[in-house]
Amino acid sequence: MSASPQGKVHTHKEILIILSGLMTGMLLAALDQTIVSAALKSIVEEFNGLEHYTWVVTAYLLTSTASTPLYGKISDLYGRRIVFQFAIVTFLLGSFLAGASTNMEQLIATRALQGLGGGGLMALTFVIIGDIVPPRERGRYQGYFGAVWGLASVAGPLLGGFFSDQDKILGITGWRWIFYINLPFGIAALVITSAV
């Protein structure tokens, strides 16, 4: 992943490495749009937050959507890799804090932070692919991202339901794992995007 859109031509191996990092980031952002919905009942019960429950999902979607156009311009100014990695770190920070939330207001605020990172993960994935592959091949790569999106749409509610049905996993309340599960995958995406 070059620092600027112009310049280096990547080998097929480098493109595959970059693609794996981008697909991991896309999976995280897409998964978090659906994983929470199945766990809302458990979250509301723990926090007595019925009046605010819709904001748990809406905060993520709103900030993700609002931040998406900003990431393209910011990455033009500062480089694709650093801005994509900033989006990963922001998403991971939001994920960790969401899992550690002690009330509904904290959860909503940290979901908004998570959405700021998620917007960058979604937007920059397509920008970076546009930078590193020729126009003739972009459709194939966008198809891969469509498959990731489809997988996340199906897996999100299933994982959310699984985690929220567990009383505790490793001593942590089950629904909190819908956020903590992002951490190892996000760290892997950071390592992968640093490799090229």
Annotate each predicted stretch with a short phrase.
Residues 2-195:
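Transmembrane-helix bundle of Major Facilitator Superfamily
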